[in-house]
């Protein structure tokens, strides 16, 4: 992951990847994890996502990690929340407020506690292929025994678009999470009117996965 690339995106407010509302995939498929309020939730590379609010309405503890300090501060400021901020190192800060615990810094070194449920909408697809194996190793290490992941990926011809977001095809998903129970919940194929197809992609699909340890 090119950290400078993402830092510049947030600094210049070029954040087309940020959705102004809850992702409909989350509201439709979260129930597939059989979640309970007491179960803890982790959202990697969370940005200032509205999905965090949706999850906090249903869970007592929602944690996240985000590279950009700008994004983390914006998350709390836009909601008029005043978090407790703890400096853990020169490159890592912890923001605490009610249900929310968000680390601003490197995903690979943030001390995330083991969690029951993970929601990954925009993290895996933000990473180039050479980083995805290490990313998933860390993700799996943070999932409790019996834990579950709701994963959203994209499938398109990587030769036709450089990314991010990157294509993570089914065979790679199954390889990365081998040894776990993997269920494809949905494949949403873009039609001819989709912006990506209009820009020249021959196919573009969003896939939703339920993964159990």
UniProtKB/Swiss-Prot annotation:
It comes from the Bacteria. It catalyses: S-adenosyl-L-methionine + a thiopurine = S-adenosyl-L-homocysteine + a thiopurine S-methylether. SUPFAM superfamilies: S-adenosyl-L-methionine-dependent methyltransferases. Its main location: cytoplasm. S-adenosyl-L-methionine binds at residues 10, 45, 66, 121. GO terms for molecular function: thiopurine S-methyltransferase activity. GO terms for biological process: methylation; response to metal ion. This is Thiopurine S-methyltransferase. The lineage of its organism: Bacteria, Pseudomonadati, Pseudomonadota, Gammaproteobacteria, Vibrionales. The gene is tpm.
């Amino acid at each position: 992951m090119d950290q400078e690339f993402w830092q510049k995106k947030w600094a210049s407010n070029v954040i087309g990847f940020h959705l102004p509302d809850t992702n409909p995939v989350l509201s439709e498929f979260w129930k597939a994890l059989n979640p309970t309020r007491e179960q803890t939730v982790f959202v990697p590379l969370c940005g200032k996502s509205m999905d965090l609010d949706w999850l906090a309405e249903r869970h007592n503890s929602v944690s996240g990690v985000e590279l950009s300090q700008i994004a983390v501060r914006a998350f709390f400021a836009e909601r008029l929340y005043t978090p407790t901020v703890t400096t853990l190192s020169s490159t890592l800060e912890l923001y605490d407020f009610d249900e929310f615990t968000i680390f601003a810094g490197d995903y690979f070194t943030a001390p995330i506690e083991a969690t029951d449920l993970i929601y990954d909408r925009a993290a895996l697809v933000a990473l180039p292929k050479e980083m995805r194996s290490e990313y998933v190793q860390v993700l799996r290490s943070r999932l409790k025994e019996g834990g579950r992941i709701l994963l959203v990926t994209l499938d398109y011809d990587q030769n036709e678009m450089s990314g991010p977001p990157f294509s993570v095809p089914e065979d790679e998903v199954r390889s990365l999470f081998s040894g776990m129970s993997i269920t494809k919940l949905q494949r949403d194929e873009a039609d001819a009117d989709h912006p990506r197809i209009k820009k020249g992609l021959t196919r573009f699909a969003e896939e939703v996965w339920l993964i159990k340890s």
